[in-house]
Amino acid sequence: MAKADFYETLGVAKTADEKELKSAFRKLAMKFHPDKNPDDKDAERKFKEINEAYEMLKDPQKRAAYDRYGHAAFEHGGMGGGGGGGFAGGGFSDIFEDIFGEMMGGGRARQRSSGGRERGADLRYNMEITLEEAFSGKTAQIRVPTSITCDVCSGSGAKPGTQPKNCGTCQGSGRVRAAQGFFSIERTCPTCHGRGQIIPDPCPKCHGQGRVTEERSLSVNIPAGIEDGTRIRLQGEGEAGARGGPAGDLYIFLSVKPHEFYQRDGADLYCAVPISMTTAALGGTFDVATLDGTKSRVSVPEGTQAGKQFRLKSKGMPVLRSAQTGDLYIQIQIETPQKLTKRQRELLQEFEQLSSKENNPESTGFFARMKEFFEG
């Protein structure tokens, strides 16, 4: 019987991204998990199909091979079978490695070790924090859906009281040789799929995988001064390895939300502050709230122009893993009055009549230079 399409098995489009694949897998795995469907052979079969489809599609190289060649890409053990995790087992080139490995002095090293143990997949978790949290640092609690070591078989995949056995086809090597003409060709063992072992009595909980899918709660330390786009690695917190293999790593990708008032450039902060035309002309003061919870008073001198910057030293962001702190720059914007009353308009017109070139040196000089440029 022809195998079902992996995308159809998971109920996703061929354009589905990593997040959509994982979400679909989790929903279906929960629905058809054997623990929820005891003695239901159809549910068990469906659960295995879902696992196989997800294991193939979550690996970019395997997915690319499947998209191009379909199930033919994995025939004859070309990619090591559907079990296992992470970034182990290379791409479609494994098919050619099986054919030419003997002539080229053996295949390349793999992440699958003796006894069928495989390293778990690395996981990615996207976290969004506020600028205030990036300023002060925090300890965040996150829940990560992942594969963990089965607590019934301790990751061996075998029913308690039993042990995996060496594969009789490859005698535990995970590879078999066949003579073709003048050449001796080495392939991945079709019986154990390169693991070197078989499990006659699978664990009733994980069905021989050595892992089960669950959500884990983890504590993540976000240091003060962390920047947008920073990646935090939690070693050994990724998916559990298959059949007792080492766990993968968890990578936390941080993004800092845009702030309503502040913009960040490294350790420095910038804040645009609008002031009235009269404050700019006559001078004045205003208070600015800073991220450390205090207020800083800014004095605006008489005749302040738009774009003027005032520096508040050490009021910026802390420098990551350092005692240094950036600065806060206040950028002045001058607000033009709107919806003037008749009296306000009259006063401004009177002010304009009383103004001289000395009151507006920049505009006066600009238009004079422009006139000279065009008229010569």
Swiss-Prot record:
Positions bound to Zn(2+) 2: 167, 170, 189, 192
Domain J: start-end pairs: 5-70
Complex formation: Homodimer.
Function in brief: Participates actively in the response to hyperosmotic and heat shock by preventing the aggregation of stress-denatured proteins and by disaggregating proteins, also in an autonomous, DnaK-independent fashion. Unfolded proteins bind initially to DnaJ; upon interaction with the DnaJ-bound protein, DnaK hydrolyzes its bound ATP, resulting in the formation of a stable complex. GrpE releases ADP from DnaK; ATP binding to DnaK triggers the release of the substrate protein, thus completing the reaction cycle.
Cofactor binding description: Binds 2 Zn(2+) ions per monomer.
Protein name per its UniProtKB record: Chaperone protein DnaJ
Organism lineage: Bacteria, Pseudomonadati, Pseudomonadota, Alphaproteobacteria, Hyphomicrobiales
Residues in CR-type zinc fingers: 137-215
Ligand binding (Zn(2+) 1): 150, 153, 203, 206
SUPFAM superfamilies: Chaperone J-domain (SSF46565), DnaJ/Hsp40 cysteine-rich domain (SSF57938), HSP40/DnaJ peptide-binding domain (SSF49493)
Domain observations: The J domain is necessary and sufficient to stimulate DnaK ATPase activity. Zinc center 1 plays an important role in the autonomous, DnaK-independent chaperone activity of DnaJ. Zinc center 2 is essential for interaction with DnaK and for DnaJ activity.
Organism: Rhizobium leguminosarum bv. trifolii (strain WSM2304)
